[in-house]
Regions:
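A polyanion-binding, active-site-adjacent surface
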Residues: 1-171, 175-177, 181-221
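Generic C-terminal helix-cap and adjacent flexible tail
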Residues: 217-231
């Protein structure tokens, strides 16, 4: 499946943007070779936690070839995953940096870096097949953490397409909101760890720790007090 993701050309707008960014670069990364292709998900194949992000960053995953790697969002996320016991180290700098995910797998709603960090709905729809294939492979998942409303909507759309949730059931989004999807599967929500959210204090390290503590409690791992719950 990784080969299929990397070779994907379904979204001309996204492919053109990723290639342009990889060629032009930014000054601080002028000496680096950019990945410039779709970015596959990665992590523990026996994971019970699936994290769904939005898309690779233009100078993060699109540069390094690994989602949430080499950018400020990844710095924030993996530090939190390390504190919660889902990663063996707090940093994600580049492929081959020694980072391992423990009981956790990271995917995205869109696999190419989008202009202005905003993939179009139809582009997310074209990427859904890859998330569906990962979902079928990750047979032990009992917790899904959606980073942002768009990511949550993408995952819910996947479940609707599979007949896993009722067609008209509404899923409220909010930081710390939790939905029971039945059969032991719970959907957790967090604000996306973008600089816009972390630099303004909308999402804090303590706030992310609280959500991950709730995930840990659900999975029977060591955790902190639960977040608020809906559904």
């Amino acid at each position: 499946m990784t080969r299929d993701v990397v070779a994907c050309e379904r979204c001309p707008r996204l492919r053109a943007w990723c290639r342009e960014v990889a060629e032009v670069k930014v000054r601080r990364f002028q000496d680096q070779e950019y990945w410039g292709r779709p970015v596959p998900g990665w992590g523990d194949p026996a994971a019970r936690l699936l994290i769904v992000g939005l898309a690779p960053a233009a100078h993060g995953g699109n540069r390094t070839g690994r989602i949430f790697t080499g950018d400020r969002s990844g710095d924030f996320l993996f530090a939190a995953l390390h504190r919660a016991g889902f990663a063996n180290q707090p940093t994600s700098v580049a492929r081959g940096d020694g980072l391992r995910l423990l009981d956790c797998y990271v995917a995205a709603a869109a696999r190419c870096a989008p202009p202005a960090n905003r993939p179009l709905p139809e582009e997310i729809g074209r990427c859904r097949e890859y998330l569906a294939r990962e979902w079928r492979l990750l047979r032990r998942v009992r917790a899904v953490l959606a980073l942002g409303k768009v990511s949550q909507d993408a995952f819910v759309a996947l479940l609707r397409g599979m007949g896993r949730v009722p067609p008209r059931k509404a899923f409220a989004f909010g930081h710390g909101v939790r939905h029971d999807l039945g059969e032991g599967l719970h959907l957790f929500a967090s604000f996306h760890p973008s600089q816009q959210n972390t630099f303004t204090g909308k999402l804090t390290a303590a706030g992310m720790d609280t959500v991950l503590a709730d995930v840990n409690r659900h999975l029977g791992r060591r955790g902190r007090p639960a977040t608020r719950r809906t559904s």
